[in-house]
Amino acid sequence: MLSNLLILPMLLPFLCALILVFLKNNDRISKYLYLGTMTITTIISLMLLIYVQRHRPITLDFGGWTAPFGIQFLGDSLSLIMVTTASFVITLIMAYGFGRGEHKANRYHLPSFILFLSVGVIGSFLTSDLFNLYVMFEIMLLASFVLITLGQSVEQLRAAIIYVVLNIIGSWLFLLGIGLLYKTVGTLNFSHIAMRLNDMGDNRTVTMISLIFLVAFSAKAALVLFMWLPKAYAVLNTELAALFAALMTKVGAYALIRFFTLLFDQHNGLIHPLLVTMAAITMVIGAIGVIAYKDIKKIAAYQVIISIGFIILGLGTNTFAGINGAIFYLVNDIVVKTLLFFIIGSLVYITGYRQYQYLNGLAKKEPFFGVAFIIMIFAIGGVPPFSGFPGKVLIFQGALQNGNYIGLALMIITSLIAMYSLFRILFYMYFGDKDGEEVHFKKIPQYRKGILSILVVVVIAIGIAAPVLLKITNDATELNTNDQLYQKLVNSHLKGEE
């Protein structure tokens, strides 16, 4: 009975999105409906996470067809901490846009497609079937393309074309990898794939397939292949930019973690050094980006790229500490990047400018944003006791254990550069007053300050309550780095199947 609840975090947003299509003339009911739906989804996800922590992973086989023949959802520590965090930030993002007045012609479509996007995101985290993961990625791609183009501006259409072309290439490679892997092992279920690959040992065909998946997921995660990201994020309104920054690249990073710990770990002689190299390139180019631009929305976009480099560096160390740190930082970064883009969007709204030199001492008149920005900088920089600290320490530890001193040095340097670029913005927030000029700032709605306050509190709480979250990420790391334990806890009925 409990396993049936596993479908609800995906089913509820899907049903709500369909209902909203017929409620476009009743704005108030629609708003309370989608906020209520995502709140309930978050609560259910949290309840499932607590159960899994106290007992064991949950599986749901659809239509009575057991894995590996049927579609299966898996609720383990990794998938459910991701679903819970994603549901939480989606709720806040939709609440942030509650009173938005621009794009009136499209405002009725916006919540529906955000919910469809959340279906793809949550489904990607829950599925333990490779083809179903592909389907969820395509749902995300379709919904995200619509969201990028809703404003119908030339800039949005240009960004959408770049975004879609690169993601379609990634999808083609993903589908090619699925076909080759199925031909090789004869199954698409994660647990069954792990069993078959273990029996095969090192194999050139499997190595080639793993490289195809690496490129496909790198396009989704903006790992090296990030050309679409800065342009796409820069043209989005605040809540959509926060949504994309918090979740889109994180789904790709999640897939990389799941694949290259559980499925293709035996081929780490090639894959993991390649992951470290790609992470290093991503961190360096991200650091160049945050220094090169004065546009605060583009600076925020390159901050996302740097954080992806951190996460994949942890995965590439192929150590328990590094992978644990990657998972912790991945979860934390969903919250922190939501906060970053909310603050950046608020600064643009208040001042009317995207260049930091026009912030005109805003923090003196709006001290709330100054304090929130400082806390966010410390969280991104990994300063104790803020939320970025535990994940970065574990990634540092993993890099040391692996002997990857270049990756470790690059992580330290790019972390400092990332903080410097944000402190540069903060400087103008406090000391950018223009003598003799009267500056007029727009007032931001109080409820949006309330949402920002919630995120600030959560960022602080993650740092303080790190031992609780580390227990979850420890369990997730142990399960995904021990394929025999994974098979025993998740799909013990597969033993002996051909």
Curated annotation (Swiss-Prot):
Q: Which UniProt keywords apply?
A: Antiport, Cell membrane, Ion transport, Membrane, Transmembrane, Transmembrane helix, Transport
This protein's record includes keyword Ion transport: yes
Molecular functions per Gene Ontology: antiporter activity; NADH dehydrogenase (ubiquinone) activity
Membrane topology according to the record: Multi-pass membrane protein
Where does this one sit in the cell? Cell membrane
Q: GO biological process: what's one of them?
A: ATP synthesis coupled electron transport
PANTHER family associated with the record:
NA(+)_H(+) ANTIPORTER SUBUNIT D1 (PTHR42703:SF1), NADH DEHYDROGENASE (PTHR42703)
Identification of the protein by name:
Putative antiporter subunit mnhD2
